[in-house]
Each structure stands twice: as C-alpha cells, then as structure tokens.
C-alpha cells in the first residue's frame, strides 16, 4: 500500500496522458470486475485512452480540473471535474487498489473540490454506478447525500447509477 505521505497531488497536463491511461484502465479493471463485462475490460486499449486523455488535457477549458496523485513509483490515481456556474461535477475519481485505504482518495477528492470552489463552485455532484458499493460508501462517509437514480447504457447492457450531492462544496474541500 502506498503511504499517504509519499504521494503528491498535482495538476495533470498533456504529458501525463500515458500515465492517466494506464491508471484509468487498471483502476477500471480492478473496480468493475464482475460489474462490467470481462470482454469490455480486457479490450480497453492504452493507446486509445492515452489519445483521449491527451486531447482532453490539450483542449481543457477554464473551470475544468484534472489532478493526479503521484507516488514513489508513478501515478496511482486521478480525479477530474468541472464547474458550470455555481455547480460542479466530479466525473472521475480512481485510485489503484494498492493506493486505497490510506486517506489518499479523500485527499485527492478534497483537493479537486478546493480547485472547483476557487473558480466559483458552491455545490458538487457526481454519479456512481449502483454496483460500485465501495465508492458509494466512501461518498456517504464523506458527506455525500444520495439522490436521483438514472439508467446508463453501455458495456453491453443497462446499469443504474445514483447521484451524490454536497450542497456546500466548502465542507468537502475542508475535509482534508
């Protein structure tokens, strides 16, 4: 397990695309095994994901944030989100299994919330697949309130996801 003190959180840029793709794919395979089809997870292509990340980071607009958690051996997690007016949304928060349960997830999440609050966000939301029980428990432990559910199509079927909300992003940004 990566020690929290050994990790730094930094803004990600286009030069981090390969590492983001590596962490993205590995974290999805670790997180969604048994929830998403094995064939989909096995077919995730590092070059394609690196291109997507590079393009996203090259075209980043004001109010968008991508933070990376870097450990001794490289990137171990990331968080991405954006603000629109007073509302912010976290699109992704993933840590490799080896970096979980050490406080780094909260540190990364709270860091993104601080960045979003600094550019005007008052409220925050995110969506989580209902089958991702560890993530749902993490968000509840950290003040998120479950809200609406919606179907999401993809991966060969339809799954449900639940919204989690924080009415005051400042309370989340102060958690770590």
Predicted regions and their residues:
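Conserved GNAT acetyl-CoA-binding A-motif
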Residues: 117-127
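Conserved beta-strand-loop-alpha-helix junction that forms the acyl-donor binding cleft
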Residues: 126-135, 153-157
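Short hydrophobic/aromatic beta-strand or adjacent loop that forms the aromatic wall/cage
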Residues: 64, 159-163
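Acetyl-CoA-dependent GNAT
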Residues: 2-7, 11-17, 22-35, 39-100, ...
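K/E-rich alpha-helical interaction surfaces of small helical-bundle regulatory domains
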Residues: 27-29, 135-140
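Conserved acetyl-CoA-binding loop of GNAT-fold acetyltransferases
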Residues: 140-148
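Acidic/histidine-enriched, glycine/proline-rich intrinsically disordered or flexible terminal extensions
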Residues: 172-174
């Amino acid at each position: 397990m990566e020690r929290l003190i050994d990790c730094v959180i930094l803004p990600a840029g286009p030069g981090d695309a390969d590492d983001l793709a590596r962490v993205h794919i590995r974290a999805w395979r670790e997180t969604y095994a048994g929830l998403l089809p094995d064939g989909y997870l096995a077919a995730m292509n590092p070059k394609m994901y690196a291109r997507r990340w590079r393009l996203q980071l090259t075209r980043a607009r004001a109010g968008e944030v991508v933070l990376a958690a870097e450990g001794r051996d490289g990137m171990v997690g990331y968080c991405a989100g954006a603000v629109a007016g007073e509302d912010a949304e976290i699109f992704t928060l993933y840590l490799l299994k080896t970096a979980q349960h050490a406080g780094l997830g909260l540190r990364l999440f709270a860091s993104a919330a601080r960045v979003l609050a600094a550019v005007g966000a008052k409220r925050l939301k995110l969506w989580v697949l209902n089958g991702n029980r560890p993530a749902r428990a993490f968000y509840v432990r950290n003040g998120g309130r479950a809200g609406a559910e919606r179907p999401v199509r993809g991966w060969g079927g339809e799954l449900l996801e639940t919204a989690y909300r924080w009415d005051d992003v400042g309370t989340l940004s102060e958690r770590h």
